[in-house]
Structures are given as structure tokens and as C-alpha cells.
Design a protein with these regions (language model features):
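Acyltransferase donor/substrate-recognition loop-hinge adjacent to the catalytic core
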Residues: 67-135, 258-262, 266-283, 290, ...
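Aromatic (often tryptophan-rich) hydrophobic motifs at membrane interfaces
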Residues: 152-257
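A conserved beta-strand-loop-helix scaffold within acyl/acetyltransferase catalytic domains
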Residues: 2-23, 85-95, 100-191
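Conserved donor-binding loop and adjoining core beta-sheet/short helix segment
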Residues: 1-80, 162-190, 241-243, 248-250
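Surface-exposed alpha-helical segments enriched in charged/polar residues
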Residues: 47-49, 97, 148, 202-209
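Well-ordered, non-membrane alpha-helical segments in soluble/globular domains
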Residues: 40-47, 140-145, 199-203
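C-terminal catalytic domain of photolyase/cryptochrome flavoproteins
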Residues: 224-299, 304-319
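Short glycine/proline-enriched coil/turn segments at helix->beta-strand junctions
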Residues: 54, 101-104, 213
Length: 319
């Protein structure tokens, strides 16, 4: 996927993206920025940060020899071609086999099919999670326009999980350089109970294992051990650490360090204990570039940690 198409996809998924001197930056929290793609290595002083970063801050990966003050942690599945169902732990293998009895995975090739079949699954996902990003898609007309824009972006694979002819869930993946991004997943309540998240992830990893052009499957940024982290780690994802430089507005830094120490530790990339296996976690729709960052309002009303917005943090302080 070309960089411009990658940026277009991130904008479509709700990110505010700005370009400064040839570098794309995404606003992952109000006035806090990281480059696109997130793993892009930037030499200090080689580019300028967005103007809005002056009010909160920015963070970017740096070369190994540079002086780093933090880490960017991502969850990825190493793709060395040897993945198979038998490589999974017994419980996750059982879930995939159970799901495959009721569900099939196949591409959704046309926008017209997606518009008609995917909207009910999205509405069910929203009612369960209250995930606010691009929640305008609850409106059928908005969802249709969003779908048209999605299908205009080249090289995105849209997979559907079907029960008979009923679409229960959707994933979006794309290949950038040698990384396959498992970018988005949502499903309805019935498909969640039938373990579609496990079957979909298995299908994506199995397909990736057959391609010598894919070195890793990127799942998400590591967010400090929440339910989504547990879902991926328990199924074999590794935490990949990348040295980074963190710059914070002095006042914002003072507030975060003193009133939100846990979030500050996550900003620095300090690893919490590896999350315990989640017995039934959903891989909710998420932007892979939405990692742990300065605190923001919690928009999820669900008490189920498997249904939390993957970027939920305590309320953002008033600056």
C-alpha cells in the first residue's frame, strides 16, 4: 500500500492527520501527535512537529544509536511461515474449531454487498461497546458514503464472517511494506458468542503464513495490559519495543506525571505485567496507531473489559 493510501485509510477511520515538511503526523489524543506510520524512524531535528504539539506533545521512533527517553510498544505476530492451527494453545484451538462449524470467512468484494450486509453487524457492535470513533456510521446514509470511500482505497482486503448468508462480522487488512496490518474488526453479538474473533484472526494469520512477502502481522499498539492486549498476547502476539523520543509541554507533563502516573508510565513505554489470557475477548474495531497516550475521556459505558474502547483512559486534565 502506498503511503498516501495508508494516510487516506487512517483519515477514513477517524484520525486527524496533518503533514509537516513531508512527514505525516496523526493526532492520537488532543494536541498529542505521533508520525504515520507509527514505526517510522525520525532523526531528531530532521523534521518539524505539528503546531498543535506545542500544547501537549509528540512522540516518535528514533534510531537505536540515538538518545531515547521512551519506547513505542506494539503487538505483532511474527510471520515466519510456520503458523498453523496446531501452533495455538488448546483453548484457542478449540474456539477456532467451534467457530468453523458455524461460520465461514470469505472476501466481500463489492461496496454494495458491504453496505447492505455490514451495517447491522456494526450497529450491534456499537450497542455493545459504545465505541465513539466514527459513530456517525450508525446512520445508514453515512455508512453508505463511508463504505464507498473505503472501497475507493486500493489494496484493502475486506473479509466477512458469515453464518449461512448472514454477515456477522468484518475485518479490514492491508499490506504496507512487509507488515500486514490487522486494522479493523467488528462483529455482532451472536458472532462474538460463536468465537468469530478467533476464527477471523486465525484466517488472517494463516493467509499471512503462506506469503513470503509478509514478515509480521501488526495487531495493535500495546496499551498496558487491557482486555485487547490479553486477547492478542494469549494467542501468540509478541511485544515489540522501539526506542522513541517523547516531548511534552511542561505544564502537560507536570499534570500527567503527578496526577496520572500510570498513564505517564505507559507513555514512557514501561511494561506492565504481561496480561493474563482472556477467556473470551473481542478484538474491537481499533486504529492500530491509537496507542496509549495522554489521558482522554472514557467513552465506553460497558463494564466488560473485552468490550472497552481499546484506547480508553481516565479523563483528560484541563490545561
Amino acid at each position: 500500500m502506498a503511503l498516501e493510501d495508508y494516510v487516506a485509510f487512517q483519515k477514513l477511520m477517524g484520525l486527524n492527520v496533518v503533514q509537516v515538511k513531508g512527514t505525516y503526523w496523526c493526532e492520537v489524543r488532543p494536541f498529542f501527535y505521533r508520525p504515520l506510520p507509527m514505526s517510522q524512524v525520525i532523526h531528531q531535528g530532521s523534521t518539524s512537529m505539528p503546531f498543535g504539539a506545542k500544547f501537549c506533545g509528540a512522540q516518535y521512533a528514533v534510531p537505536p544509536e540515538a538518545k531515547a527517553n521512551s519506547f513505542l510498544n506494539r503487538l505483532s505476530f511474527e510471520n515466519n511461515g510456520d503458523y498453523s492451527l496446531d501452533s495455538l494453545q488448546r483453548n484457542w484451538k478449540r474456539k477456532v474449531r467451534l467457530a468453523s462449524k458455524d461460520l465461514i470467512i470469505r472476501p466481500i468484494l463489492t461496496a454494495s454487498e458491504f453496505k447492505q450486509a455490514a451495517h447491522p453487524a456494526y450497529l450491534s457492535f456499537y450497542e455493545r461497546t459504545r465505541y465513539k470513533v466514527r459513530s456517525e456510521r450508525r446512520d445508514p446514509a453515512y455508512f453508505a458514503n463511508w463504505t464507498d470511500a473505503l472501497y475507493r482505497i486500493p489494496n484493502i482486503l475486506v473479509l466477512g464472517g458469515f453464518r449461512d448468508r448472514h454477515l456477522g462480522g468484518v475485518s479490514l487488512t492491508f499490506l504496507k511494506d512487509r507488515t500486514l496490518f490487522y486494522a479493523t474488526f467488528f462483529c455482532d453479538d451472536d458472532s462474538l458468542k460463536l468465537h468469530l474473533p478467533d476464527l477471523m484472526l486465525h484466517a488472517v494469520r494463516e493467509s499471512a503464513a503462506a506469503s513470503p512477502d509478509i514478515s509480521e502481522v501488526f495487531a495493535s499498539m500495546y496499551k498496558g495490559g487491557n482486555g485487547l492486549d490479553a486477547f492478542y498476547v494469549s494467542r501468540g502476539a509478541k511485544i515489540v519495543r522501539q526506542p522513541a523520543h517523547l516531548e511534552l509541554n511542561p505544564l502537560a507533563g507536570l499534570i500527567i506525571r503527578n496526577f496520572f502516573p500510570r498513564q505517564y508510565a505507559q507513555l514512557l513505554g514501561q511494561l506492565a505485567d504481561v496480561p493474563a489470557p482472556a477467556s473470551n475477548a473481542e478484538g474491537p474495531e481499533s486504529d492500530p496507531t491509537a496507542p496509549t497516550a495522554p489521558p482522554r475521556p472514557n467513552h465506553s459505558s460497558s463494564s466488560n473489559p473485552n468490550d472497552l474502547d481499546p484506547a480508553d483512559l481516565p479523563p483528560r486534565p484541563r490545561l
